[in-house]
Amino acid sequence: MKGAPDFSIFNHMDSRQVMNRVEAIIETHKTGLLATVDEEGKPHIRWLTPAVLRDRPGAIYAITAGRFAKVAQVKSHPQVEWMFQTPSLDEVVSVRGAINVVENPSLRAEVLEVIGPRLRTFWKLAHDTRDLAVLETVVEHATRFLPMEGRKEVVHF
């Protein structure tokens, strides 16, 4: 493509460093985009409020209601992608991995403790706390894109 920038790919970051960047973006901006695929192979993308838990490296967590469509989607097609970005778009991190629907009460409590206060919109839609499930994305691959520097970092976990 004529005039397209030639982004250099660097592999200087390791999995811990890229997850630290994901955590920093989440802590500052509170949201990320989750892309899933439905039973017909059609893509769906939505904003969620995720968290990175220090005791559980290499994973991204979110809360959902068991009746929401994304639960059926990830059970049928567990490969997903998250995107995190700064408001100025000077840093964009995309993370791919396999997602699990976890119904472990202690993990649910741990995730809720971290992100529960940030879930105002979610609580309007999910009325029954007994229906909550944890989405655990086990990260397999990440790309950190710094468009203003023409730089891309690729990390395999």
Predicted regions and their residues:
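A short, Trp-centered hydrophobic/proline-enriched beta-strand micro-motif
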Residues: A24-E40, V80-F84
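A generic structural signal for short beta-strands and their flanking turns/coil linkers
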Residues: K30, R46, R56-G58, S76-V80, ...
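A short mixed-secondary-structure module that forms the rim of ligand-binding clefts
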Residues: A51-L89
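Histidine- and/or cysteine-centered catalytic micro-motif in compact active-site loops
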Residues: V37-E39, A65-R67, Q85-P87, R96-N100
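Short, basic/aromatic recognition patches
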Residues: F7-T31
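Short, basic, glycine/proline-bearing loop/turn elements
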Residues: A4-S8, T36, L48-A59
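Charged, gly/pro-rich active-site loop segments
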Residues: K2-D14, S94-F157
